């Protein structure tokens, strides 16, 4: 049986996705060297340098990584300097997790301390668990204790990320209330006075989707422990086109793919389609039915990347509206028959009318009709 490639023979450069602190190590080093501002206790960079890392700095050759609401980034950084946790809420695909990763990488140098909220998340996942072999052999001890990411963050004075917190049952969410208020964790198995005190620099960044299934409302007591920031979809058309093109180039370059000709007007067509189906309104103000499916910028990049791969390997290396139409099915055809009807209506009316005046839109319409019969 093949065991695949051993970890030692797999260089980090071949990793599908590196953590931000590894991917942008050179940028972080330049920011650290040039950072003359005061740093909060436990922070790797000053607040100004954290902002530069996320929003970019041409002088230091630091790339922009988060697009959209710059003041939101400032407020998030300020929140993390205080005693409140940071709650990033918004629709799926609006880069909440990306922003939390970037903040953790810049502030703590470690974005990997993460609790993933699910229906199966238990108190042990938030606090600590035990190595039961050692527990049976030695009894309760520090050696037998298995620290959770939150425990490690408290001990080291770092940020911990809590992804999709509203997927956890309410009684599990509320475990955080005392931890965030008292900044200490009781460990009764190690003695009546055993406790872990959070070190300076510790805080929590949580994310929650506003429009998703299988979520639980947070208690008002827990909400009071967080400052809420809403991450909204990008509304500026040209800005979103530039972002999708930049992300697509990064994906193609990172995947080692041969060059693909990506016309801007094809990406603009994709972004227009996503924005109109997301907003339930066309560019000229005509009201249409929006979709239940997530039509985020991240999904647009996924569609563009899949279409570019199809163009490269099957259709001569030039991305056209034909590939976009084919890959759009994967976004819409998930679990909503109503969405399929709405998209067909969109193609039969809006796209068809534009196709009378524009060759790309005609290709888009004809390809979609052939695929979506």
Task: Give each language-model segment a name.
Residues 2-257:
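AAA+ P-loop NTPase catalytic core and its hallmark functional loops
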Residues 23, 49, 149, 239, ...:
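Exposed alpha-helical structural elements
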Residues 46, 122, 146, 161, ...:
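A diffuse structural propensity rather than consistent per-protein peaks
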Residues 70, 248-319:
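Conserved AAA+ ATPase small/helical "lid" subdomain
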Residues 76, 270, 274, 327-328:
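Short alpha-helical scaffolding segments that buttress acidic/His motifs in well-ordered protein cores
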Residues 99, 276, 330-334:
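A short structural micro-motif
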Residues 225, 243, 306-310, 327:
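A general alpha-helix detector
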Residues 312-373:
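C-terminal engagement/docking regions of AAA+ P-loop ATPases
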């Amino acid at each position: 049986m093949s065991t695949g490639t051993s970890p030692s023979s797999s260089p980090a450069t071949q990793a599908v996705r590196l953590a931000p602190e590894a991917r942008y190590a050179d940028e972080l080093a330049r920011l650290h060297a040039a950072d003359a501002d005061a740093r909060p206790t436990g922070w790797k960079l000053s607040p100004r340098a954290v902002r530069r890392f996320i929003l970019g700095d041409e002088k230091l050759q630091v790339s922009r990584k988060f697009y959209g609401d710059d003041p939101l980034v400032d407020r998030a950084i300020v929140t993390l300097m205080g005693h409140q946790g940071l709650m990033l809420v918004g629709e799926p695909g609006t880069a909440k997790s990306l922003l939390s990763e970037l903040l953790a990488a810049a502030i703590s140098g470690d974005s990997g301390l993460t609790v993933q909220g699910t229906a199966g998340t238990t108190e042990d996942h938030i606090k600590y668990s035990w190595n039961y072999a050692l527990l049976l052999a030695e009894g309760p001890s520090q050696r037998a204790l298995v620290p959770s990411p939150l425990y490690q963050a408290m001990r080291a004075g770092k940020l911990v990320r809590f992804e999709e917190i509203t997927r956890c049952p309410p009684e599990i969410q509320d475990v955080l209330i005392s931890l965030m208020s008292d900044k200490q964790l009781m460990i009764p198995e190690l003695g009546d006075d055993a406790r872990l005190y959070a070190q300076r620099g510790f805080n929590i960044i949580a994310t929650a989707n506003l429009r998703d299934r299988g979520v639980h409302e947070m208690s008002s007591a827990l909400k009071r422990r967080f400052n809420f920031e809403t991450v909204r979809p990008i509304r500026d058309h040209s800005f979103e086109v530039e972002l999708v093109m930049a992300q697509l180039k990064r994906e193609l370059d990172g995947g080692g793919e041969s060059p693909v000709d990506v016309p801007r007007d094809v990406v603009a067509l994709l972004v227009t389609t996503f924005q109109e189906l997301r907003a339930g309104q066309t560019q000229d103000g005509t009201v249409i039915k929006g979709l239940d499916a997530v039509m985020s910028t991240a999904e647009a990049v996924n569609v563009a990347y899949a279409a570019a791969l199809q163009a490269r390997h099957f259709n001569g290396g030039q991305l056209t509206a034909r590939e976009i139409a084919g890959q759009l099915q994967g976004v819409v055809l998930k679990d909503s028959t109503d969405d399929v009807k709405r998209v067909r209506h969109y193609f039969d009316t809006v796209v068809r009318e534009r196709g009378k005046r524009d060759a790309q839109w005609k290709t888009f319409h004809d390809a979609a009709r052939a695929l979506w019969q």
